[in-house]
Amino acid sequence: VRSAHQHIEIGEHPLFGRVFRLDGRIMSAEADAFIQHEVMVHPMAMAHGSPASALVIGGGDGGSARELLRLPGMREVVVAELDAEVVRLARRWLPRIHHGAFDDPRVTLEIGDGLAVMEALRDSGRRFDLLVFDLTEADDGSPAAALFGARGLQAAHDCLAPGGAMSLHLGPPFHRPDTARLLWRRLGDHFRLVQPMTVAIPVYGALWAIAVASDTLDVRAADPAMLAARLADWQLDGALRCYHAGLHAALFALPRHLQPLFDGGATSA
């Protein structure tokens, strides 16, 4: 489907099931979407301890919203998706990714430019405990490019409540080290703590980097015993397919060859 903004494809793959692509780039697949969405949401949610509100920029496949809705104290999830066609197609063809998230009464769907939505929310005084940038890559010229610039990252910072955190894709650090480092450094211009995670995402065919950023929440330092107790208390221990208490520290343990990419400056805790 060619929408007003991009070319949208959902096709069948023998290994990955239904695969969702935008402008030729794979965004998610039924078989392994849980990996990226759990890693984008649960490390910072567990470290926070009591998230009640969340904002997703992008996320038209509903996967991030689905993970946020699994948090027991979550009262509100706002999803700001540029393209109504993405949501329409995802609702029909990607139920194994969104699991009906868009029909949950706690979800508010805003169709429009993510930067404009964030600035409007900020200017109205709205603040969120968690923020997920679930977007296409940060290439110049992509529909999401402005969100990764100074104005977009400052708006994201300003939308967070005290103690809040955001997550965002840095991309494949081995294949695109310059892009990953640039995003890392840009985040450091707006947040005191910027911490990279890496995880293998099969459909991307690469080790993938995801950052969590906050002024005060040290996600990386979360105590393993606390995480295990919280997962059990929230009835998520065993329910999640990727994230668990033992994985938390491992996500932040960078391979040695990637450590120089993210060291230095004021961008690491």
Question: Where are the regions a protein language model picked out?
Answer:
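SAM/dcSAM-binding transferase cores
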Residues: 1-12, 209-269
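The AdoMet/dcAdoMet-binding core of the Class I SAM-like
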Residues: 3, 28-165, 174-184
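Glycine-rich, charged/polar anion/phosphate-binding loops
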Residues: 6, 115-116, 195-199
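Short strand-connecting beta-turns/loops that link adjacent beta-strands
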Residues: 15-16, 162
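Structural detector of well-ordered beta-strand residues that form the stable sheet scaffold
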Residues: 166-167, 195
